[in-house]
């Protein structure tokens, strides 16, 4: 059995000043968005629209707002609505933790819609640009989860099981690593190559929704359900139920918009 190293939450300390690992992972996610985004805007579709690096910066700013606001509101609505109805001011205490990927996704979609309107283009043109950049950013986020020793997995006796001393001494799935590799690295590589070929507007976005939904749905079988929710209908977690519409909508987009040259 492996033991989680219990990293210092701060990656860098200078006197009373500290840069935490999770903040550093967010920074890395933003940097990779801009670096890979430079490559994405070279595609003929975006060159024809006159996309520039400044567009990427504006898009990143809008996306960050969407992630933070949507992620927090999604967590309060999907996971702990009763608690936050009784303690509404707690919604604003982001530093205490509590973010939802699915809520963050809805926030980003709203930001992309606003950005598309501002730039007088279509929503899926923007979302197709962004989709291949998201998984690698998620990988950094899951690495931050692992370093912090949070979002651990269910008990297991597999050889690579890991105990997380912050919770107990039970050997568990290192589910953060599963998600890092699945919805982060593997999905990112597959989506990058898929988006590199001629696709109809909307198909790349559909591939992301389908791919993420499947990866997250499967990873949830290894991840410990939230203690305050447990498992819901059909023995599925909240995360799995939220992935179901993603999967079906992803299939819809990929099959509705048939392949067409850019």
Swiss-Prot record:
The keyword Endoplasmic reticulum does not apply. InterPro entries: Lgt. One of its GO terms (biological process) is lipoprotein biosynthetic process. Its EC number is 2.5.1.145. The chain crosses the membrane at residues 17-37, 59-79, 94-114, 121-141, 176-196, 201-221, 231-251. Its main location: membrane. Pathway: Protein modification; lipoprotein biosynthesis (diacylglyceryl transfer). GO terms for molecular function: phosphatidylglycerol-prolipoprotein diacylglyceryl transferase activity. Belongs to the Lgt family. Catalyzes the transfer of the diacylglyceryl group from phosphatidylglycerol to the sulfhydryl group of the N-terminal cysteine of a prolipoprotein, the first step in the formation of mature lipoproteins. This is Phosphatidylglycerol--prolipoprotein diacylglyceryl transferase. It comes from Polynucleobacter necessarius subsp. necessarius (strain STIR1). The gene is lgt.
């Amino acid at each position: 059995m492996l033991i989680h190293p219990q990293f210092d939450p701060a990656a860098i300390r200078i006197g009373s000043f500290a840069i935490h690992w999770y903040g550093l992972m967010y920074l890395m996610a933003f940097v990779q968005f801009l670096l890979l985004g430079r490559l994405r805007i070279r595609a003929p579709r975006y060159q024809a629209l006159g996309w520039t690096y400044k567009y990427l910066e504006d898009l990143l700013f809008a996306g960050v707002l969407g992630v933070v606001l949507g992620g927090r509101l999604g967590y309060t609505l999907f996971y702990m609505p009763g608690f936050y109805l009784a303690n509404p001011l707690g919604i604003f205490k982001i530093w205490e933790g509590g973010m939802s990927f699915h809520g963050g996704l809805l926030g980003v979609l709203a930001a992309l819609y606003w950005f598309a309107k501002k730039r007088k283009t279509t929503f899926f043109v923007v979302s197709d640009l962004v989709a291949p950049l998201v998984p690698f950013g998620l990988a950094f986020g899951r690495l931050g989860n692992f370093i912090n020793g949070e979002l651990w997995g269910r008990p297991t006796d597999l050889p690579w099981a890991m105990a997380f001393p912050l919770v107990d001494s039970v050997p568990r799935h290192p589910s953060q690593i599963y998600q890092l590799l699945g919805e982060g690295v593997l999905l990112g590589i597959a989506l990058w190559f898929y988006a590199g070929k001629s696709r109809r507007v909307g198909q790349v976005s559909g591939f992301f929704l389908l791919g993420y939904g499947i990866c997250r749905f499967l990873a949830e079988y290894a991840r410990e359900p939230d203690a305050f929710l447990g498992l819901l209908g059909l023995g599925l977690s909240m995360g799995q139920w939220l992935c179901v519409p993603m999967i079906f909508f992803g299939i819809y987009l990929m099959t509705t918009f048939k392949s067409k040259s850019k």
